[in-house]
């Protein structure tokens, strides 16, 4: 599967601040898709609409630290 690179090259840093315990399976899968599975983990991701949608879905469990 070929992934397209973002045109602008912008990135977003996301940190997990909440536990997925007592949350739905979809929210757990979304965290896993973002590369987060333990508290205080940080990931630098491409700033795309898909990533923004995933962040919005679990906005109560993550914090956006930096947007470049």
Curated annotation (Swiss-Prot):
Keyword list, A-Z: Ribonucleoprotein, Ribosomal protein
Gene Ontology CC: large ribosomal subunit
Taxonomy, superkingdom: Bacteria
GO BP terms: translation
GO MF term (any one): structural constituent of ribosome
NCBIfam families registered for this protein in UniProt: rpmD_bact
Assembly notes: Part of the 50S ribosomal subunit.
Similarity-based family: Belongs to the universal ribosomal protein uL30 family.
HAMAP family for the chain: Ribosomal_uL30_B
UniProt name for this protein: Large ribosomal subunit protein uL30
